[in-house]
Amino acid sequence: REDEEHTTSLLRSGRVMAAVTSTPEAVQGCTVTGLGTMRYHAVCSPEFNERHLDGRADPDLLRQAPVVDFDRRDELQNRFLRGFVGSEPSGPRNHVPASEDFAHAVMLGFGWGVLPEAHCSTRIRSGELVELAPGHPVDVRLYWQRWNLRSSVLDRVSEAVCAGAAAHLHRL
């Protein structure tokens, strides 16, 4: 798993022939196709909300509260907090580098985190998760970059990626 913020380096190095990136500029020798926007929401468990945030998204409490990051390169939590309160988290950080385990850690109250809308919207509606800042999602624009060469296999992969994106992402 590579974060879309870091996949362009894999294309540049030649380690991959195609990748989902958050970079709209084509890597030399590649073509770029806009896929859509992945929407994320800052969430926490109801228990975490009461224990660390006094039941409200107070900027000072949120900044100091424990955070769950995917890994050390994960910038989504920082990006959310900079946009919402103007600074980055200063509380303890937990790293959980597996998607389902990451969401599970947030649900168990290890900290607050930014989860994809597809993974948290039902849980927000059911009350299993609390959205910390309704109306303040983190949107990440995604692009498909692939080497500019003729390859029936790469063409089929590209078609599948674009079809999946059209079905699951917000339009650019």
Locate the predicted segments by residue.
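Active-site-adjacent beta-strand anchor residues
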Residues: 1, 70, 95, 113-114, ...
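Central regulatory/effector-binding core of bacterial HTH transcription factors
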Residues: 1-28
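Short, conserved clusters of charged catalytic residues that mark active-site
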Residues: 2-6, 27, 53, 97, ...
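Positions that flank functional sites
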Residues: 5, 26, 120-121, 139
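Paired acidic/hydrophobic, glycine-rich loop segments that form the ligand-binding mouth/hinge
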Residues: 17-21, 111-115, 132
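Short, well-ordered beta-strand segments
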Residues: 19, 43, 68, 113, ...
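C-terminal regulatory
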Residues: 31-110, 119-138, 167-172
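A late-sequence structural motif
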Residues: 134-172
